Swiss-Prot record:
Stated family: Belongs to the CarB family.
Gene: carB
Region Carbamoyl phosphate synthetic domain, annotated ranges: 541-931
InterPro entries the UniProt entry points to: ATP-grasp (IPR011761), ATP_grasp_subdomain_1 (IPR013815), CarbamoylP_synth_lsu (IPR006275), CarbamoylP_synth_lsu_oligo (IPR005480), CarbamoylP_synth_lsu_oligo_sf (IPR036897), CbamoylP_synth_lsu-like_ATP-bd (IPR005479), CbamoylP_synth_lsu_CPSase_dom (IPR005483), MGS-like_dom (IPR011607)
Binding-site residues for Mn(2+) 1, renumbered to this chain: 284, 296
EC numbers for this chain: 6.3.4.16, 6.3.5.5
Region (Oligomerization domain) location: 400-540
Cofactor(s) the protein needs: Mg(2+); Mn(2+)
Protein's UniProt name: Carbamoyl phosphate synthase large chain
Amino acid sequence: MPKREDIKKVLLIGSGPITIGQAAEFDFSGSQACRSLKEEGVQVVLVNSNPATIMTDPEMADSVYIEPLDARIVEKIIEKERPDGIIAGIGGQTGLNITSELAEMGVFEKYGVQILGTPVEAIKNTEDRELFKETMLRIGEKVPQSRAVHTLKEAEEVVEELGLPLIVRPAYTLGGAGGGIARTKEELLEITERGLRRSRISQVLIEESVLGWAEVEYEVMRDANDTCIVICNMENIDPMGVHTGESAVVAPSQTLTDAEHQMLRSASIKIIRALKIEGGCNIQYALKEGDYRIVEVNPRVSRSSALASKATGYPIARVTAKIAIGMALDEIINSVTKNTPASFEPALDYVITKIPRWPFDKFVTADKTLTTAMKSTGEIMAIGRTMEESLLKAFKSLDIDSQLGNKRWDEHEVKTLLKTPTSERLFVIFHALERGMSVKEIAELTSINPFFISKIKKIVEMEKRIRTEELTSELLREVKKLGFPDTRLAELTGKTREQISDLRHDAGILATFKMVDTCAAEFQAATPYYYSTYEDTCETNPTDRKKILILGAGPIRIGQGIEFDYCTVHAVTALREEGIETHIINNNPETVSTDFDTSDKLFFEPLTMEYVMNVIERERPDGVLVQFGGQTSVNLALPLKKELKRRTDLDTMIMGTDPEDMDLAEDREKFYVLMQKFGILQPEGGYATSQHEAIEVAQRIGFPVLVRPSYVLGGRAMEIVYDEIDLERYMKEAVRVSPEHPILIDDFLEGACEIDVDAVCDRKDVLIGAIMEHIEEAGVHSGDSACVIPPQSLSEDVLAQVRDYTRKIALGLRVKGLINIQMAEKGGKVFVLEANPRSSRTIPFVSKAVGLPLAKIAARVIAGHSLKEMGYTDEPKPKHVSIKEVLLPFDKLPGADPVLGPEMKSTGEVMGIDYDFGRAYYKAELAADNLLPLTGKVFLSIRNADKPELVEVARKLQAAGLELMGTRGTVNYLAQHGVFMDTVKKVHDGSPNVIDMMRRDEVDLIINTPTSKQSRRDGSRIRRAAVDFKVPYITTIQAASAAAAAIETMKKGEDLTIKSINEYHKEMGL
């Protein structure tokens, strides 16, 4: 069936901000779908609220709307653009939910829009838990016994029917949000209440437990001709009871018998046919001794399909998009081999391992147990010839400190941790085997297949040999083949990494590279995608062209998000446009940078010195770029420079800003000297290596002070400390964070306005991309604060000072490429807080707001062009207001207090654009799922320091027609200023208090600013309840003031502007 000629214009819905359960995989699949449709001559209209994505670049689609993913707004875009069809399954759960809502609202009928690919019926039959169960039973497939419920009373009845434990799965939610495992009746009611609130149709499925069964996934594809193929099968190392996004996963499955594989393969094809899904789909099974149950079907591109795409090299999203416009699998050419049709099933001659990356280093109080609801923010993937090699490379890729076996647990802890799955379980298995526990005992405690435990045992036994035997070249060859990195060998033998590396080279033990080609080398591949191993033949052939290697950003985690992948992709694109051969090394399967056709060569490897050097030794690039991959690649800059200097046989150099200059900016003392030279103000500060010194410095500066370790990303272990007791507690916890670095103590500029600047420098001129004014005050991490372009309250004098400082610092640090500078303004004076001569997390937002691709411009500067010759000298002046707001993951992390501070907590971001601040801020909050109410009740409970600013906020809210209520202190204070409202009991004074009111849906907005740590308990319970009951909440007075301004604007009845980013840029003359 050739492409449909009646489909000329297609609307694609993106997935919105990165959140737990929905990470960068949808940018990767969305970008692939956009390109796939454009190849077929179809016009693409894209809507997504997340500016940090490649898919929202103006050139990716014919019209790009960065607007809230809200059904009413998408309807306005449909009214304006009149697309012929819409593809729902590319934007993850968000895309499916909005498509279902629009269908229910009758929008598609009204405007004659067809749903392409998977029909709404199929979405309903998979997402509505009751319909799904009926469909499966109708075709004779087995599902766990279950019942869909809509009330707590119905949930109680299920306990009588099915007994405990039970699994709760809400309908239409993401990453298992709101679900969980209930082992008692109380737990069941608590999880069900949470799940009913989360579900779009207030429905949860309560099902019998298949805990301990193996979890296996099949990635399947079907076209309108009913041709079906199985792309990949994957096996979770963790058994059922842990969400697949939380489990370590291997592909292809390792423990299935051929009979089991054929049984599940046949079931998969039967299911996708029965559901009439067109495109890619993911089916999850529980398997036990030849018996199976179907757990769920995702009728869309998912996190698992991104993994399957990278594991096999098969571009699932690209093919799905072509099927949606009527093409058949045998008409679509496999873009990796360029000569086989997409109907050929991929074959693998290697093993991949995926391990999630969790944010528990940021949320110390959050519950670390892994359940059916996701908590991880990102993941890594590793490729090896054997299970052991793949697993060891995966551990190396995680970029966390828990090097194998460095953590110690006692016997009781080991048994507890094996029984309950946590983020450390794989490390605990290592430790248990080292202690002599048997494979059988560990398998019984964990329900993990003994096959996987025996593979880990093989690694543990090899470690014993390395410790006790002489490291001969035979043993070294054997351990490298097994996958041991040089750093681990150095630890086990008491040598340095360099010594191990030299031993290898002397013995001629060098890494070789194998190709991922979708067909186990049966056909010639056209798009090179490689992994390293230790075998005889090497499949990569270096060219003589000028080439540059770019280091990627690794797994998505808090503090290091998709923004750095965005910068990496832009740098690659710019260099390829210059005719330079460009290579990427990265290990994140969810991103655009690891797509098969982003770079000239892709190396799927851990981002460590050894693996980077392996690529350099083989390919001999002219230069390496480290400034685009965030802290991960910046941390490699100095060591890599030293290693390249040590290796006289290599001519490769680090391009862009010199690592020594990057280090100067990171080293507070050296940087302070530079600032003094330029006469630039900095907050008063000092550093300390002991508790005694810390107290002395803090007393000299005066409390409150901001304390942090040196060299950190995303403000880890950073805190505002108000008194000596607080400081003593911090010193006990923080000195562990970085033993060899002192702790920094700065004057905390209370009430200052924070400013961010992104710029490009070519060592002669400086291009300022934008000056951003933060909405939250200094003291909230810049990555967690909303910010606005252009600044709304900074005077011309202050802006002139900011521009002057930016130029001096960029030229003073000899920056070649990007630089981000954070400043704060207090009383008309500008203080510089820090400078980072590398890509920053605001680059994508700035690029979209002002229409300048800063990362591309920086890459061209590094390639040798000057800003002047490219015509980039003036700071852009947008006519519109752009606001970046963040997405906080508290709803997925029970137990964490939803409060902002100097340590970064957000996972993703959204953007609101309009012609005035009020409407832009309203859009940003709507996009961040924090809808500001225009009617209803607002609860206020504010710390004393914020009360003077509250009066104006309360007046605006009352004038807009909202009812106010608050706790006694706030009510009395406002009454003295002529604002009267109802009093509500404090939480610890008993009922009825605000939490009771939230439970009864009687509160529409919570404004609660936290007091000092000790008396936060009440506030913490209110904020936590707001998250659990899905009530919009605000925790800073600045955000409350911005919200009041937005509500005031919206009540004037002005419509929101619906315009594409292309139109906004056109108005700027771009």
